[in-house]
């Protein structure tokens, strides 16, 4: 930990109940951010090969927004159970044409630290390379990226202060006798029907009802409002080295299952080509275990065509406590996989439509010329 940031790391723990309710919500959430960020800039020396506490991630988001004002905006999504603000970054180039949205969230399970590390890596790679890398430039010209670096902020902070292997959120249940909901069992996708528990002490406690948690409400409300334009929903997890497609709650397949598998396998091949890491591709019900209430299945159920869960390194040697020495390689190979998925989304939703428009235009011009020749 950098000496200058030590104090702000501690402030980043944010004791619940701090916010005064006589102030506006905007003032409240700004106070939270003000109290966890350092007055010194961290961006120039920010290491993407380290895990960062939430205070540093808040500050990183603010400084990324300030440095790349031409393409980055920061947006409020909602408040966590313990009254911390949830922000996402929108990376977008101005365009006169409608653009499809790519959604990516990380850290829905608190202990999976490599996931937020990848979200930060993804943002860094896009912003540092979009001007010179033709592949990224083409994608950003036609797609908007919405990135939520840490979804389960309360739980993530708890893994830094108290229990490194904490999984759930930090909501209170049974009169304060047990804590936390598995946010990836709380979405309205065959909620709590299989692979989840109604026991609040369970790691897979599904909550008191679908979307019962403020974090899942915030995400689902936003996604619902944009679903007509969202082409791809990516949620990053660990561990297991898997690319999962819907569904977890049934062995039945989505109506575009073969396409999802094909795109996913291509991504796994791109990932393997980087460092030789093997990933398996399939539905959770087929290659992992049955689950209900996942964000991936919910996203597909509401009509988002491409919906994937990435389970990053490793296969169990280190499990959730993946060493920092593996961050770079993990992020490099995952970046190749994600770009492969985005290439396919681009081909389907932009290139194909453009080609169709060009063909229609050529047909109209041909008919017009034929008509003119008869005059």
Swiss-Prot record:
GO terms for cellular component: apical plasma membrane; extracellular space; side of membrane. Residues 1-20 form the signal peptide. GO terms for molecular function: metallocarboxypeptidase activity; zinc ion binding. It is a lipid-anchor; GPI-anchor. It is found in: Apical cell membrane. Its EC number is 3.4.17.-. The keyword Glycoprotein applies. Keywords: Carboxypeptidase, Cell membrane, Glycoprotein, GPI-anchor, Hydrolase, Lipoprotein, Membrane, Metal-binding, Metalloprotease, Protease, Signal, Zinc. One of its GO terms (biological process) is proteolysis. It comes from the Eukaryota. Pfam families: Peptidase_M14 (PF00246). This is Carboxypeptidase O. The gene is CPO.
